[in-house]
């Protein structure tokens, strides 16, 4: 339990990233952690889309990050962008109120 509490206390938001690829094994573990998150009524309304080609990642990096922070703090510089993105897709036909499910899954990542 202490390991979990220490992890929760020490986590933070990252906005600068190393340009190392993520192995398929690590990516699978991240997605498995998301899938193990609680789901209201066990409806499982979420799916995940992994974007990892450099061309597609560059499209996401054009988005504004941390809008409340000054640009120098919130926006990654060239060479600091993420090497992949994981999109969390909500199927509102399964559960129209699945925002909490998405938050729990993202928190597990």
Indicate where each model-derived feature is located:
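Compositionally biased, intrinsically disordered low-complexity regions enriched in proline and serine
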Residues: 15-18, 37, 49
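Alpha-helical scaffolds flanking conserved acidic
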Residues: 26-30, 102
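Glycine/small-residue-rich phosphate/adenosyl-binding loop
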Residues: 39-106
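Alpha-helical structural elements
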Residues: 9-12, 31, 43, 60
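Specificity-determining recognition surfaces
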Residues: 1-27
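Membrane-targeting and insertion segments and their boundary/processing signals
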Residues: 1-4, 30-31, 76-80
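Covalent nucleotidyltransferase
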Residues: 34
């Amino acid at each position: 339990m202490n390991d979990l509490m220490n992890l929760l206390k020490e986590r933070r938001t990252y906005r600068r990233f190393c340009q190392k690829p993520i192995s398929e094994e690590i990516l699978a573990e991240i997605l498995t952690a998301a899938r193990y998150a609680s789901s209201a009524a066990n409806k499982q309304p979420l799916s995940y889309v992994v974007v990892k080609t450099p061309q597609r990642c560059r499209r996401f990096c054009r988005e504004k990050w941390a809008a409340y922070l000054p640009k120098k703090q919130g926006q990654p510089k060239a060479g600091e962008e993420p090497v992949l993105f994981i999109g969390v897709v909500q199927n509102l036909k399964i559960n129209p109120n699945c925002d909490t499910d998405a938050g729990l899954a993202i928190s597990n990542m």
